[in-house]
Amino acid sequence: MLALHTWTLDSTSLPDVLRITRAAGWDGVELRRVDFARAAEKGQAAAEVLRLVKASGLRVACVGVEMGWMFADDSERRRLLEAFAESCRWAAELECSTVMSASDRGRGDLARASANVREAGDIAAAHRVKLAIEFNSQAEQLNNLDVMRGVVTRAAHPSCGLLLDTYHLGRSGATLSAIDDVALAEIAYVQYSDVPRTGLEPGKALDRLPPGRGSVPFKEIFELLDRKGYRGFMSYEAPNPAAWARPADEVAREALEATRACLPAAR
């Protein structure tokens, strides 16, 4: 199942993103917390966003949460976990089984991160959703598969798993064998986009491309996931100002065509 992440069409309004995503043939959509925040800035309640998404007829693959809670403590931790619970409620109302969080960008205590993951897992479980946690290749500490896998493994919560993002896997130098070493039970969700072959800049990640345009071995990765038995959504998350400047319907169609060209024949 293939979903389009709303960040991919960031310069397009949410109603148009939903219409374009469905018309292009995607199976679902991934929502961000900022989609709700932008609506609130226009005086629209979260309930209105939920009605809009439900009316689109699209399945919701995942709902993003506010990041920063992994190393947080005291009042900021409480605030972020309250926001986390709110995103879980939205996901549940949309009949979406997954919420995702990017890793914290700075540095902190890994034991605290695992403890906070366990608490977040309890919140997710209470809403009957699963938390998928992503490492960010451009973060200071939680920037590779090994370290994030360690945090999640130490948390040992059945409602928490890894989010594998091909862009961050590629930028961090993860090998196919390292990805293959991750058991199916550890994988909660998948996001994907390609990494440019040249021109990469440390700390910058708004250069993502459709499959086949860069250095990620998509056919091998998709085959690997298929062989493992992963049958959840794979979400195309490709923020790129060059794409935002183009007609959104073209971006959505081209990305889906590029993705399908890399999928195993059975998919």
Task: Describe the residue ranges of each PLM region.
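Metal-dependent catalytic neighborhoods of phosphoester/phosphodiester hydrolases
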Residues: 39-46, 73-78, 110-111, 245
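Active-site acidic/histidine proton-transfer and metal-coordination neighborhood
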Residues: 15-16, 52-55, 59, 70-161, ...
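N-terminal small/glycine-rich loop or linker at the start of catalytic domains
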Residues: 1-5, 60-71, 201
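Active-site-proximal loop/turn and secondary-structure-junction residues that shape catalytic pockets
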Residues: 8-10, 33-35, 66-69, 103-107, ...
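Glycine-rich, proline-tolerant flexible connector loops at the mouths of alpha/beta enzymes
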Residues: 30-54, 103-107
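Histidine-acidic metal/acid-base catalytic patches
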Residues: 1-3, 10-25, 50, 56, ...
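Short, conserved active-site loops that position catalytic residues or coordinate cofactors/metal ions
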Residues: 24-34, 62-67
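Conserved beta-strand positions in the central sheet of alpha/beta enzyme cores
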Residues: 30, 62-64, 100, 132, ...
